[in-house]
């Protein structure tokens, strides 16, 4: 299921406002309609949260769900909400990685319990609660060594390993409520911006793709601003799966 890439909106910056307002505050005054659709921003090559101060730049690119970078931010935030829900329901789960991918997102977990379809329904219900709470995504930049100690205390071994590969002295974390993750960002202003979502499947995945490392459980999902968009995606996905099934049947002469 392919989604067309549309150019995002570029706006000239009033230099008198630089550093005095957040990007979201500035945008609400410039274009109230666009502000309701904005997910994040880009200045030069930097991706920024809407809660960041208006940067020192001449032009700023506003990312919405209509462009690829905006969809990535949207779905990355959805992956954090899913991971938050999993940690609430399964506190022993260890967090690995959870990126946005072309048509959705996934998150890898290390957990002795094997996820079953009923678990996905429970996780979805918890995600709906988190979205209803409208928890804000808060960026925090700290010393790398402090982050290592923080995640060690939480028993998050995979995050500690990832931090060992980061050369920078400072790293960024994102919080929503009690949930904290190591992440470059950016993210949506809050979880309440996520409109519709669906957890699609569970698969096994070796940590870092190495068969000698632990086998993790990967939950795949997708998210859209509206239920109509999600329903259309699921309909097209089902049609594609049916075509593949029929083609395979012909190839195997079934």
At which residue positions do the language-model features occur?
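Short, basic/aromatic beta-hairpin or loop at an interaction surface
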Residues: 31-41, 80
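Short amphipathic, charge-patterned alpha-helical segments
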Residues: 19-33
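Short, Lys/Arg-enriched N-terminal segments with co-localized hydrophobic residues
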Residues: 1-6
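Short amphipathic alpha-helical face segments that pack within enzyme cores
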Residues: 22-26, 77-85
């Amino acid at each position: 299921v392919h989604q067309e890439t549309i150019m995002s909106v570029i706006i000239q910056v009033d230099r008198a406002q630089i550093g005095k307002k957040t990007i979201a505050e500035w945008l609400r005054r410039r274009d109230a309609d666009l502000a309701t659709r904005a997910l994040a921003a880009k200045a030069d090559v930097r991706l920024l949260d809407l809660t960041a101060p208006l940067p020192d730049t001449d032009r700023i690119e506003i990312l919405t769900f209509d462009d690829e970078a905006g969809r990535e931010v949207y779905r990355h935030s959805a992956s954090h909400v899913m991971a938050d829900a999993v940690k609430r329901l399964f506190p022993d789960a260890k967090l690995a990685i959870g990126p946005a991918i072309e048509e959705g997102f996934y998150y890898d977990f290390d957990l002795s319990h094997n996820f079953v379809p009923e678990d996905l329904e429970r996780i979805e219900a918890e995600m709906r609660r988190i979205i209803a709470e409208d928890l804000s995504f808060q960026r925090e930049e700290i010393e790398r060594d402090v982050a290592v100690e923080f995640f060690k205390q939480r028993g998050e071994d995979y995050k500690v390993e990832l931090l060992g590969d980061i050369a920078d002295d400072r790293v960024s974390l994102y919080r929503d409520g009690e949930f904290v993750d190591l992440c470059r960002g950016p993210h949506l202003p809050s979880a309440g911006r996520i409109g519709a979502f669906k957890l699609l499947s569970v698969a096994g995945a070796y940590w870092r793709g190495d068969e000698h490392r632990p086998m993790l459980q990967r939950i795949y999902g997708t998210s859209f601003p509206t239920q109509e968009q999600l329903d259309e995606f699921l309909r097209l996905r089902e049609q594609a799966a049916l075509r593949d099934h029929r083609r395979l049947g012909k190839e195997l002469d079934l």
